[in-house]
Amino acid sequence: VSDNPFDPSQWQSVDGFDLTDITYHRHVVDGVRQPTVRVAFDRPEVRNAFRPHTVDELYRVLDHARMSSDVGVVLLTGNGPSPKDGGWAFCSGGDQRIRGRSGYQYASGETAETVDPARAGRLHILEVQRLIRFMPKPVICLVNGWAAGGGHSLHAVCDLTLASREHAKFKQTDADVGSFDGGYGSAYLAKQVGQKFAREIFFLGRPYTAEQMHAMGAVNAVVDHAELETVALQWASEINGKSPQAIRMLKYAFNLTDDGLVGQQLFAGEATRLAYMTDEAVEGRDAFLEKRDPDWSSFPRYF
C-alpha cells in the first residue's frame, strides 16, 4: 500500500496553466468541485527547492486562488517522493546552484553555467510570503518532508501547519549559506514559538521533528504520513463550513497588530465592504446620485 498522501482521484488539475515546477489542483467529490485547492512544489528530485521560475508559477497560482471567489482554503505542500532516493520534502528553500550576488537567477538549465546574465537576480519568494499573508482565506501548509531555509519560512507564514509524523523535518539553514529571513520567517516565527526557541532555530540551524515543532507551537497537528492530505481536507472542510466573511475578518484581525498600517488597511477594507452592504451606506450613495441631502433619521447611533 502506498504511503503517498496525495490521492489523484480526489483532485482535478486547474485549467489554463502551463506549469513545470508547480502543480495546481481543485478538490472534487463525485465530479463536483469543492472550495479547496492544492498547490504543490513539483521538483522532488531537488527536495522541492525553488528557482525564480518556480516562484513565478507559485505566485501566479496562489494569486488565482486568491481571486477565485469559490475557493475558501488553499493547501500548500510538495510533491514526492524523490525519484532519486525516495526522500520527501515540502520545500528546501532556494536552489543554491543558481544563486547569484543579486539573488536567485533565471537559468535555462540546472547549473550556474546556464544562468541568463541579462536578467537580474530575484528574491521574490518574499512577494509570495506577502501574498500568503494578505490572502483573505486560510493557507494550510502540509509539511510532508523537509521544510528548510526558505521552505521553513514559507511554513511559518502560513496560517496553519500540519506535519508528517514519519517524514517531516524542520531546519532553518539560512545562516549556513549566508542568508537570513529578517521578516515573517524569523520575527513572526518568534510570535509562534517564543524568542528563545526562534533564536535557537536560527542560530543553531538544527533539524527538528514534527513532534518537537508541535511542542514549540509552530505546528498545529502531527499526522501519519499517509493520512496527511486526508486530514488536511477535513480541516479545510470545517473551515469552509464557516462564514467566509468571518474567516476573512478573523485572518486580518490576527494579522493586524503585526502588520502595521498594511494590516490595518486590509482589516479596514473588509470593514468598508461590510459597511457598503448596509441600508445606511445605500442611502448615502443614493443621496449623492440623486443630488439631495441624505436622510439619516432611520439609522440609530449604536453604542
Question: What does each model-found stretch correspond to?
Answer:
Residues 1-84:
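Conserved CoA-thioester-binding segment of acyl-CoA-metabolizing enzymes
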Residues 39, 43, 57-58, 76, ...:
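Terminal peptide-recognition signature
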Residues 201, 253, 257, 270-276:
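Helix-loop "lid/cap" segments that line or gate small-molecule binding pockets
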Residues 130-244, 278, 286:
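Crotonase-fold acyl-CoA enzyme core
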Residues 14, 46, 78-128, 178:
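Glycine- (often His-adjacent) and acidic-residue-rich active-site loop
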Residues 33, 85, 163-168, 219-266, ...:
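C-terminal long alpha-helix characteristic of the crotonase
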Residues 204, 216, 249-256, 287, ...:
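Short acidic/histidine-centered micro-motifs embedded in hydrophobic/aromatic stretches
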Residues 43-44, 242, 291:
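Short loop-to-helix capping motifs
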